[in-house]
Amino acid sequence: MADDQGRGRRRPLNEDDSSTSRGSGDGPRVKVFRGSSSGDPRADPRIEASRERRALEEAPRREGGPTERKPWGDQYDYLNTRPAELVSKKGTDGVPVMLQTNFFRLKTKPEWRIVHYHVEFEPSIENPRVRMGVLSNHANLLGSGYLFDGLQLFTTRKFEQEITVLSGKSKLDIEYKISIKFVGFISCAEPRFLQVLNLILRRSMKGLNLELVGRNLFDPRAKIEIREFKMELWPGYETSIRQHEKDILLGTEITHKVMRTETIYDIMRRCSHNPARHQDEVRVNVLDLIVLTDYNNRTYRINDVDFGQTPKSTFSCKGRDISFVEYYLTKYNIRIRDHNQPLLISKNRDKALKTNASELVVLIPELCRVTGLNAEMRSNFQLMRAMSSYTRMNPKQRTDRLRAFNHRLQNTPESVKVLRDWNMELDKNVTEVQGRIIGQQNIVFHNGKVPAGENADWQRHFRDQRMLTTPSDGLDRWAVIAPQRNSHELRTLLDSLYRAASGMGLRIRSPQEFIIYDDRTGTYVRAMDDCVRSDPKLILCLVPNDNAERYSSIKKRGYVDRAVPTQVVTLKTTKNRSLMSIATKIAIQLNCKLGYTPWMIELPLSGLMTIGFDIAKSTRDRKRAYGALIASMDLQQNSTYFSTVTECSAFDVLANTLWPMIAKALRQYQHEHRKLPSRIVFYRDGVSSGSLKQLFEFEVKDIIEKLKTEYARVQLSPPQLAYIVVTRSMNTRFFLNGQNPPPGTIVDDVITLPERYDFYLVSQQVRQGTVSPTSYNVLYSSMGLSPEKMQKLTYKMCHLYYNWSGTTRVPAVCQYAKKLATLVGTNLHSIPQNALEKKFYYL
């Protein structure tokens, strides 16, 4: 498809009193679609309501399931959880530093109230843009700054009458009666006030000539072409205005949109030409893809392919039948090349949400550009490296881009006028905040403790330190499975493993070897069945490559059908120059899978259980999901963990099955210590955007009540509880003099939210790009810990992930929960054996 075809010039909207006048930029739509080339008389081109109305109506709506990204801290999810007795949530411990952020302060806070009106037209006008045009005749009356989405009007001017009646004419000289009904005031304290501010910002950004793709703005004129992979990167911005601790701040993050230059038509042509297989193969490769139509800069999800219709098919438009070929030529000056290609069907999700009506959008394959990356592309190292060279910006590059955006916004006349009309002015400098750097934590080994280091990486200390706990008789009964042709590589791996483990205090004896003569999945599984007859403590499989089917089968046999920890090592690993370093990591994993602990941190609290919880969707059935809970068993006493998994609905965001998992962890703790924990810190990951209120009402309160009941049964007071929501996917960034802040950096002021007990923590070092802080929102706490102790405890918990000898972005229990939930949802698709609950089998 030539570029000029896909980017046909837009024509001005024409007004029409019929329902077909809604056509403005989407393809033709049908309410009931039938596979007939003669056309459906009910089909007509339409346009939805403006994006400004959708922003107001849908801002609080949850999307994307349990692990959706939460860009600016749940933008419209307002829940006041800051304890009344908490005078200050700022800590004092640590070295103070001045940090720069990706926020800009709103210098002149508007001192006005926004007036909300509802507008009706008589006779009725279906097309929102026509409504906007008719009302714009009274711009002077409405005031210099007003927002109108075709139905709702927002302005700073209050009319004297409750209902103000005006008249106006359209471009076709049709006169309309306009009724403007007063709804109410929106004060600065209301969440809707911030929504309006965001709409004002979006309106001001129109002057930057950016394209709206999805919900963010991108600059196609600054696109970066990666021609060898038929791909473009569009730079853009994610923005949000919100009331922070003291000021209203504009958060700005640099983002990129992956735009593939290939179309759905190109993908279809690559599919099998065998008539018996072609349609099925097309559907496998096309369904659920997100596409962009350049003629209206809209994105759609492909829900079906209709092989019964072609661009020659007709539909009813403005009282006559018209083919798709003629429609696109007349509407967009686009000539469709292949008149025999099938049509694509996309459900109009926004329309369905508002009206519960089923409306479908009809699309032409050769006009649909594919967006995003598929699994094959993500596994292409060269492609990902080429992309990251543009998208992975260091702190200086990022701050330069932020300042350039601010300068562009404040020097574009159209943008400046919008902000001035609303009496708004942005600071030209990024917002600064004083943070603190917590001191290095001590890592406790069997024979001593060492500081974690400035970069929070203690890999080198394994040269002279023994792991904290190891089996007294070592790894004495285990098995390996390897192809006969790789016997030499197996010897190399085992020799390196013996040496690495010995230096860390883990004695590994020679395994029972099961040599196989091919590398088929079934051969490995049958060899595992032979292995288990000798009751091994662990099975190691040497495999030729990263075959997903083989890996899943090995894990399922070990964890679902049996209860034997498995370790899968690829042949490529044995040929790595850093084999001894890799062997050290494998030895640590083997020790963990046996149920032992490589290291610990100094923990001042006794009787403490830390819990991590996360959810992962099943890759086999997207309606199903698996929740994983990891709980520590008093790390001051025995440094062990407990894990449990349950199946739940992918839409069960509030995890109604959570309490039984907590109860199992409590029983295990009681079994090991002959008492229940006196303190519980629950780190809740996997919370979807907009669900904090539901989470607090139905999950937190439920846990509190059930803990009271559980402890009352043994005549104990309920434990001290802290419930903390962990958000790892944030757009918030901060920098230290053009560099990444070091691990242990805390921010608990200025950019935090006044209604929350929250803080940001940078807990890990990154070698490339810009570090992303993690947000912690304390929804509930009866712990009695000061803010700095809560922050320090959280940082300590980031030192205990045993797959990596360094800190992690989130507390280890969260990382373990994510790892386990992903393993079950991706590979096992069944609940693992209970006998594995005390072992790190999921590492």
Curated annotation (Swiss-Prot):
Start-end of Basic and acidic residues biased regions: 41-72
- What does UniProt note about where in the body, tissue by tissue, this protein is expressed? Expressed in ovaries (at protein level). Expressed somatically in ovariole terminal filament cells, epithelial sheath cells, cap cells and follicle cells (at protein level). Expressed in nurse cells and oocytes in developing egg chambers (at protein level). In embryos, accumulates in pole cells (at protein level). In larval and adult testis, expressed in a germinal proliferative center at the apical tip containing somatic hub cells and mitotically dividing germ stem cells (at protein level).
Q: Which residue windows are transmembrane per the record?
A: none
Q: Which organism is it from?
A: Drosophila melanogaster (Fruit fly)
Question: Is Cytoplasm tagged as a keyword?
Answer: yes
Instruction: Name a single GO cellular component.
Output: cytosol
The UniProt annotation puts motif Nuclear localization signal at 1-12
Query: What EC class does the entry list?
Result: hydrolase
- Residue intervals of the Piwi domain: 538-829
Q: What is this protein called?
A: Protein piwi
Principal location listed in the UniProt entry: cytoplasm
Which consequence is recorded for altering R11K?
Decreased binding to papi
